[in-house]
Amino acid sequence: MTTAAPTTSTLTGVPALAPLLARGALLSPLRRPRPDADFPRTRLVLPGLRVDLTRLAAYERACGFATGADALPVTYPHVLGFPLAMRLMSGRDFPLPLLGLVHTSIGITRRTALPATAEYELAVHVEGLAPHRRGTEATVVTEIRTGGDLVWESRSTYLARHRTTARPPAAGGTPAGEREPLPARAEWHLAGDVGRRYGAASGDRNPIHLHPLTARLFGFPQAIAHGMWTVARCLAEHGTPDAAVVRAEFRAPVLLPGTVAYGAQDGRFELRGGDGGRRLHLSGEVGPYPAA
């Protein structure tokens, strides 16, 4: 993966998402993605950030977290960082097309519980690009600090699909999609408005999540659930320690409306189709930080 030390740009407010998404859509046809392309070397920093408790409560309700808790859900800082990530990924110097970009994985490290009423410094940068067997993958890093201490960080990978000669690394063990399903703990019947409710709470109003008509424009037969909603919903059910490490991989889209089965065993969790579990939508694991 290509890496470089980023320069710092300090923001005075949260970027508005709508114009960023529009700019990214307009620039997408001009992109020619490749793993050796240059990428933005800027680290965006937003100091003095406070959480909007009304939006937080809407997010908690949409994802199944208990409302009114003193601490932020483990996935919520991703929502806080999303506008900064979109500012970087919609810019002219980001080489991958925003339209069609697929969120493939997220890794989260939370070093302590994050009070909902605290003041934070938010920072986001693109760590690098890497070849993928289906195209080019970008890694975007989000960090949360309070009092100068790093308390939460994530690494998200986003895939731009294109023709490539890259060979996949040799795989060890059984692919996740071919493993025996984890013990089923719950079956969830998902309404058609899950994407709209999560989009309103998170700000991520990608048209593939909002309505069947807009989803069909991008090749989906129905609206699909946000990947980050699926992992948040699973973690709301599973629970996480105050200091935790989370890793999740997004395997296949969840069509809305639909039925899914939540499975879990020890620190592992997954989401499978309600068709007997043949289709794996999400796999992940959660454990303590630091690891025992």
Residue map of PLM features:
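HotDog/MaoC-like acyl-thioester-processing domains
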Residues: 1-30, 34-38, 83-86, 104-190, ...
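A conserved acidic, glycine/proline-rich C-terminal tail/linker
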Residues: 234-262
